[in-house]
Amino acid sequence: MSSITIRGCCIGAGRPKIILPIVARTEDDILREARRLSALKADCIEWRADWFSDALDAAALKRVLSGLRAALGEKLLLVTFRTKAEGGETSLTPQQYADFCGTVCVSGCAELLDVEFFPNQEELPALIGQAHKAGVAVVCSSHDFHKTPSRTEMVTRLTAMQQAGADLPKLAVMPNSPSDVLELLAATAEMAEQHPETPVITMSMGALGAVSRLCGETFGSAMTFANPGQASAPGQVALDVVNEVLDSLSLE
């Protein structure tokens, strides 16, 4: 598996880098949570902008982005608008989604931008190109909240993201059996061994899949999401537990 270095953070080497989500409705609550998370042992903060009540107001969006960048210090900022189709809070038209991504890119405040794979396949090259032009790395994401696809399908999806130009392909799936979790881990290992052009981020969701959030260094998932008090997805493990287990399972 290759690595990518962003603001001194090497993603894809050593223990998985930890992402903490911010899910809050108001500007004050978002920035208050950012200040709290900035002191915790993690590498990146994900702002889930679909929770923000004024996310489509460009002026409000720029103001929050600026406040987040100031609050987070050296931590990376990943900005995500998770649409309802991918398990998020709000639906957007393609133009609204493109406008949101454009505002994030030109703000100069975010190191990483989440771009959803399935809802935006036609627009994907343009969205990724726009981000790269602004110096923003792209996490290209796909979610299945009902099942775990076959290993072949998961690898095909992740490699398609690589081919579209994503810096960090991301896949989250729901297991219905322990063997589903093994399929996700096997697909992750296959990506690391046979398609190492980029790091990848993978997870099996829910309590059944929680183990996948803790063994990324072994199987090849470069980042993991931890719960700092309020989870943004099913199965996120408490931050202190994640840090302890990642240290215990370190291969270094």
Stretch-by-stretch model annotation:
Residues G8-R15:
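Eukaryotic low-complexity, non-globular regulatory regions
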Residues S3, R15-K133, H143-K147:
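Active-site beta->alpha loop and helix N-cap motifs at the rims of alpha/beta catalytic domains
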Residues G102, L112, F117-E252:
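Catalytic alpha/beta core domains of metabolic enzymes, predominantly
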Residues M1-R7:
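Short beta-strand/loop segment at the start of cytosolic alpha/beta domains
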